[in-house]
Amino acid sequence: MKLEQYLSELRPIAVIGNIEQEVSDIASDSRKATDGALFVAVRGTLTDGHRYIPQAYTQGCRAFVVEDLPDEKPEGCCFVQVSDTAEALASLASAYYGHPSRHLTLVGVTGTNGKTTVATLLYRLFRKMGYKAGLVSTVCNYVDDRSEPTTHTTPDPLALNALFRRMADAGCEYAFMEVSSHAAAQKRIGALDFDGGIFTNLTRDHLDYHGSVPEYLRAKKSFFDGLGAQAFALVNADDKNGLVMVQNTRARVCTYALKSMANYRAKIVERHIDGMDMYMDDREVFVRLVGDFNAYNLLCVYGASCELGQDREEVLRILSELTSVDGRFQTFTSKDGYVAIVDYAHTPDALINVLDTIRPLAKSHKVITVVGAGGNRDKGKRPIMAKEAARRSERLILTSDNPRDEEPQEIIQEMAIGLSTEDRKKTLLITDRAEAIRTACMLAEKGDFVLIAGKGHETYQEIRGVKHHFDDREVVCDAMSKDRIVQ
């Protein structure tokens, strides 16, 4: 395809050079640029793509999309100037792969907590209903029944559109994806044709990137601002930010809630270690997930399925068959009678939700919590997480969790600042995460609950740029001498 044809996807400020040249590929990473590729110079958080135009030229690129025109323009090159290269990359990526999202019923899920569970359960539900479907998530990507590894919650525009192209070519009718705040802010989802948007909740997270809660909210809201009139916007009415999200959307707005008036409502009747009895839209259903947060997730899945035109009774029947997502309230029972739970909870609110779910299940028995905080991330949440964990646990172990470029001992000390004198008496500081988990299991007795929070599905510990193999679930099973039952 000629460069001239791609220009219709952009709103160029200026075009200098030959637009008749063929474009063989599109690249935003100069290391991946090939002969005849169109190089898009995107300004990132750590570097500026404009700096790598010479390298892209050396590797054979002769067409460039830029925000700033270079002083020197090599002969035979074409420079297309636009106001926003990130936005341009999204449009070009969609066009390069034949606008694949237009051939899918695409639903995006955003929010601080619950994105992975909601997107994954929707994918599983629609597969069980006989549809071919795709999934883009933190844990794994799926093209129908074929899994693909994932590196980001939301991939870059080129990888994302390539993935949707594979889904469309495989005959998928539906696609469900997590939409991170980073992806929205960086316009990775620009030019995608969404048929639905879902908002789960909003609490403190990613302030190391966004700077403030209002900016974090604004990034999430931009997703709904971009929805078309043909789409639905399903929001949590029990979250004060739910209706803020859809203030400026053109989409059809609908709500779900456990407490407030909403289009889709549910009530928890009874809680068990292996599930909950619920009323959902005045219909009784037993579900195999645990916790109020999962009641919201399931209700959200139900509402979205109904908005997509599915039969309500059939949706409820399949909802009762669905089980938890890997690393989300994943339970292991020891031969000694205590229960260990591995969960991805890595924000104060998520930690509170999980511990508040465990407390009534533990009854008079102990709750032992193992938790850390990620390095190079929002430092403000560290003492809050320790404080909230201590309030809800009989024993607390602070440990390492992806320290990245920071010293793990320093992160742990920053967490410990949130502890009172009394809290410190029941707290252990153990830097080695495996030792921390083993210690928690040694302290546990029959009927106790051990929560290992923060990593969930992750299979690595990131230290100074290197991802070392580490899986909380493997360590738990080893501590239980592999005599466990996965619920």
From Swiss-Prot:
Enzyme's top EC category: ligase
Motif (Meso-diaminopimelate recognition motif): 401-404
Keyword line: ATP-binding, Cell cycle, Cell division, Cell shape, Cell wall biogenesis/degradation, Cytoplasm, Ligase, Magnesium, Nucleotide-binding, Peptidoglycan synthesis
UniProt cofactor(s): Mg(2+)
Alphabetized SUPFAM superfamilies for the sequence: MurD-like peptide ligases, catalytic domain, MurD-like peptide ligases, peptide-binding domain, MurE/MurF N-terminal domain
Binding site for ATP: 111-117
Gene Ontology terms, MF aspect: ATP binding; magnesium ion binding; UDP-N-acetylmuramoylalanyl-D-glutamate-2,6-diaminopimelate ligase activity
Pathway(s) annotated for this protein in UniProt: Cell wall biogenesis; peptidoglycan biosynthesis
Ligand binding (UDP-N-acetyl-alpha-D-muramoyl-L-alanyl-D-glutamate): 30, 153-154, 180, 186, 188
Binding positions (meso-2,6-diaminopimelate): 377, 401-404, 454, 458
Keyword Ribosomal protein attached: no
Protein family according to the UniProt entry: Belongs to the MurCDEF family. MurE subfamily.
Function statement: Catalyzes the addition of meso-diaminopimelic acid to the nucleotide precursor UDP-N-acetylmuramoyl-L-alanyl-D-glutamate (UMAG) in the biosynthesis of bacterial cell-wall peptidoglycan.
Protein known as: UDP-N-acetylmuramoyl-L-alanyl-D-glutamate--2,6-diaminopimelate ligase
